[in-house]
UniProtKB/Swiss-Prot annotation:
Protein family according to the UniProt entry: Belongs to the MnmA/TRMU family.
GO BP: tRNA wobble position uridine thiolation
UniProt-annotated site: Interaction with tRNA, residues: H129, Q345
Protein name (database record): tRNA-specific 2-thiouridylase MnmA
Species of the source: Streptococcus equi subsp. zooepidemicus (strain H70)
Alphabetized UniProt keyword annotations: ATP-binding, Cytoplasm, Disulfide bond, Nucleotide-binding, RNA-binding, Transferase, tRNA processing, tRNA-binding
Cystine connections: C104-C201
Subcellular location, record wording: Cytoplasm
EC number: 2.8.1.13
Gene3D superfamilies linked: Adenine nucleotide alpha hydrolases-like domains, HUPs, Translation factors
Domain of life: Bacteria
Organism classification: Bacteria, Bacillati, Bacillota, Bacilli, Lactobacillales
Annotated Pfam families: tRNA_Me_trans, tRNA_Me_trans_C, tRNA_Me_trans_M
Length: 374
């Protein structure tokens, strides 16, 4: 029996990119009552006075007109500043390396936007994320990795709750990126050949150091080896992340071998950046971590232990872990030592194809001793 989707209203978050354009197109073709909404989260007028959001909104309007759906623009600049950007700055201020995309999804795209969509009479919201939604016989929603393994975005969606997922659709989840491009080209969408946006949304193509220095004053300090050798000056702890190789300016200085130099630690109180030679430098290896802001995609007990796999950064293979959860905190013990576990980044849990949720890394440990990462 065919279902009548025309009575189901879906509000699509449209960015002006090809993914969200095809999302709207597919839902329209499936008979849903579709409305497109462009979110303006950041005043991104560049040094030439060109606002890229204006260009993106024009693309949204062109696509919406092509596929025959109404569209609106909503301004979330204040919400974004308060809930995402202030968090981003606070994390850098405390020597950590945040992932603003995780917080943007949690607070803006699936909270502020979801709330706004409800005022438009939405039954669901949809975005162009590469993830899959599966509903079981009890009505519980499971979030699965996107079919396109190279594009899977469940890592960035790991802070979504069951309540948020119940109202969410990911129409691209079963497609390869190449198929999405082909659909856009076949339909002659205005965004079919538009290149994907890269980097953090509010920085765009700007130089990261320059951008950050507008908001946080850089404090130069000493760059040291773990055994106390002074290697020169660092530009400010906030500019470096654990495991980073480039940008240290000490490539010519050797320490007995020809291995490259890496950031292996930070001491915020002394404003010291620690460096060491070798990709697997012992200071970069850890055996467990503490995380907070733990969020599971399904209802779970307040306290439990879980054996699963985890990712500690976006583009890395899963690693086997044991997770000890207590309310919104967790201790994650690794089956094998892990490299460059970075406070502020997301740790995300998986059971096979299913994303179970995740948290934010607070501290890494090596055999029970804290690593000097902040």
């Amino acid at each position: 029996m065919m279902t009548d989707n025309s009575k189901t209203r879906v509000v699509v978050g449209m960015s002006g990119g090809v993914d969200s354009s095809v999302t709207a197109l597919l839902l329209k073709e499936q008979g849903y009552d579709v409305i497109g909404v462009f979110m303006k989260n950041w005043d991104d007028t560049d040094e030439f006075g060109v606002c890229t959001a204006t260009e993106d909104y024009k693309d949204v309007a062109a696509v919406a007109d092509q596929i025959g759906i109404p569209y609106y623009s909503v301004n979330f600049e204040k919400e974004y500043w308060d809930r995402v950007f202030e968090y981003f700055l606070a994390e850098y201020r405390s020597g950590r390396t945040p992932n603003p995309d995780v917080m943007c999804n949690k607070e803006i795209k699936f909270k502020a936007f979801l709330d706004y969509a409800m005022t438009l009479g939405a039954d669901y919201v949809a975005t162009g994320h590469y993830a899959q939604i599966k509903r079981d016989e009890n009505g519980v929603v499971h979030m699965l990795r996107g079919f396109d393994k190279g594009k899977d975005q469940t890592y960035f969606l790991s802070q979504l709750s069951q309540k948020q997922l119940q109202k969410t659709m990911f129409p691209l989840g079963h497609l390869q990126k190449s198929e999405v491009r082909a659909i856009a080209e076949q339909a002659g969408l205005a965004t079919a050949k538009k290149k994907d946006s890269t980097g953090i949304c509010f920085i765009g193509e700007k130089n990261f150091k320059t951008f950050l220095s507008h908001y946080l004053p850089a404090q130069k300090g000493r760059m040291m080896t773990v055994d106390g050798r002074d290697m020169g000056e660092h530009a400010g702890l906030m500019y470096y992340t654990i495991g980073q190789r480039g940008g240290l300016g000490i490539g010519g200085q050797q320490g007995g071998d020809n291995k490259p130099w890496f950031v292996v630690g930070k001491d915020l109180s002394q404003n010291i950046l620690y460096v060491g030679q070798g990709f697997y430098h012992e200071s970069l290896m850890s055996t467990s971590l503490d995380a907070s802001v733990i969020q599971f995609t399904r209802e779970v007990p307040e306290e439990f232990t879980l054996e699963c796999t985890a990712k500690f950064r976006y583009r890395q293979p899963d690693s086997k872990v044991t997770v000890h959860v207590k309310k919104d905190k967790a201790k994650v013990v690794f089956a094998e030592p892990q490299r460059a576990i970075t406070p502020g980044q997301a740790v995300v849990f998986y059971d096979g194809h299913e994303c179970l949720g995740g948290g934010i890394i607070d501290m890494a440990y090596k055999d029970g001793e804290p690593c000097q990462y902040i």
